Amino acid sequence: PAAYGTDFGVILKPSDKILINIAAWYLYLDQEFVYVGDAGVVEPSGKSKRQGIDVTTRFQFTKNLFANANFNFTKPRAVGEPKGANYIPLAPTFTSVGGVYYKAQKGLNGGINYRYIKNRPANEDNSVVAKGYFLLDAAVNYTRPKYEIGLAFENIFNIKWNEAQFATESRLRNEPAPVTELHYTPGTPFFARLKLAVFF
């Protein structure tokens, strides 16, 4: 199936320490594919369109201290469906990633970064919602010419979040009929990892 898209963007550099990229875009698909949880496959669901704005920022505070943040705004809709029943299941509407990093060729280096996704429709009428999340990860390393020792932390605040999630029918033993509701795989809880690397 055909896909048609266009975008327009600008790159701004207000100073030698700041870089900003802003792009507006539009995408039209002759055929959208939607994940079917029960079957574990994707199936065609008609035409769709998306329009959005992406913002990318980069900052350099010092020779070794950096930061970045990306913001992605999207309005995804099915074409030819009535308003209120034209949502695209699981299509993100707002996501963002970013962080602050200290980078050095040797000695201590590391950073902290975040991941965010907003609540989004899990079915066509938005009666079932896929839950968003905000997670923080961090890492610190000690680097020498011959080796590196590091410690990484995922989900620092031990937030309960859903990783894979979708709307599908299920029925418990005491229920008279199947119910369409959110099914999900729990996301990784707080996790720490020790790293040792040897350079040859």
Walk through the language-model features, giving the residues of each:
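Membrane-embedded beta-barrel scaffold of Gram-negative outer-membrane proteins
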Residues: P1-Q51, Q60, K160
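Residues that define the transmembrane beta-barrel architecture of outer-membrane proteins
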Residues: A2-T6, K47-Q51, L90-S96, G132-L136, ...
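Short coil turns and loop connectors of transmembrane beta-barrels in diderm outer membranes
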Residues: P14-D16, F61-K63, K75, K106, ...
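Gram-negative outer-membrane beta-barrel transporters
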Residues: L19-L29, P44-E124, K195-F199
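Flexible, surface-exposed loop regions and adjacent strand-edge segments
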Residues: D30, V36-P44, K83-P92, S127-K131, ...
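C-terminal beta-signal and adjacent terminal beta-strands/loops
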Residues: A67, N119-R120, Y142-F200
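Short, glycine/charged-rich beta-strand-loop motifs at protein surfaces that mediate ligand recognition
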Residues: N123-V129, L136-V140, E181-L182
